């Protein structure tokens, strides 16, 4: 499927990619099978700290120019120049999925997921969760719509399959220097559950900020995880706008320092275990994977139903 926007992963700054990768190391990740499903030229691969560099890298990029550049830059990685919907990776294969998923108000044709009617960014999250193993981590940038939209369907879907270990809301200027655009986006850290469960934690639903703006309950309860304040965007949509953006007008604001501080609030522990290679991998080196353990999170409090 064609994208409405061009190569979001290309425009992810190396600094943001490094912050996300460093979070995985902070959690204890020390290498395994890593997928970037919308990789652009591979800024996440190029920003891996030393402990992650022993990983086996897999990438997907629909744009042929960016994909060919990535193949040249990361010649030991398994990179496919195609849409994520065309890939056939087995479920439960990857230890970590990282990246910046494409944002857009359009859908991808994939027979396995068509019944959910997901927008492209939510589709990427759903498929990534299937392909990461139980206990694995999906650490991706997505539009704020995933957490803030009024319809909770995607959040209910994700919550049944993963714990939201943590999230950080970026200000709308986070991609301005690299992409020339202002967009409010979130970094999500999702740990896949051992099995699907019927659960409805607070973050499936919306709350309000101190100034009465609708926002995901996670951010209403943890405003320190927003790198700015939520406002109505009246510049584009007029005085009656209900479209919200995350804004930080502090002239001394250092996004990367603040982002690292926010990520430091997220607690998770990862311990090594040895993956049993299947027949297709018997001739290859077996790379130790990492299994994520977290203590029961207060963010998974269930609502009475």
Question: Where are each of the predicted segments found?
Answer:
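Class I S-adenosyl-L-methionine
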Residues: 1-73
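Conserved SAM-binding strand-loop segment of SAM-dependent methyltransferases
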Residues: 76-83
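A short acidic, Gly/Pro-enriched loop at the edge of an enzyme's catalytic core
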Residues: 89-97
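Mobile active-site "lid"/loop adjacent to the S-adenosyl-L-methionine
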Residues: 101-124, 146
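Conserved Class I SAM-dependent methyltransferase catalytic core
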Residues: 118-174, 189
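Flexible, glycine-/basic-rich loop-and-beta segments that form/coincide
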Residues: 177-274
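Conserved small/polar residues in nucleotide/adenosyl-binding loops
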Residues: 293-302
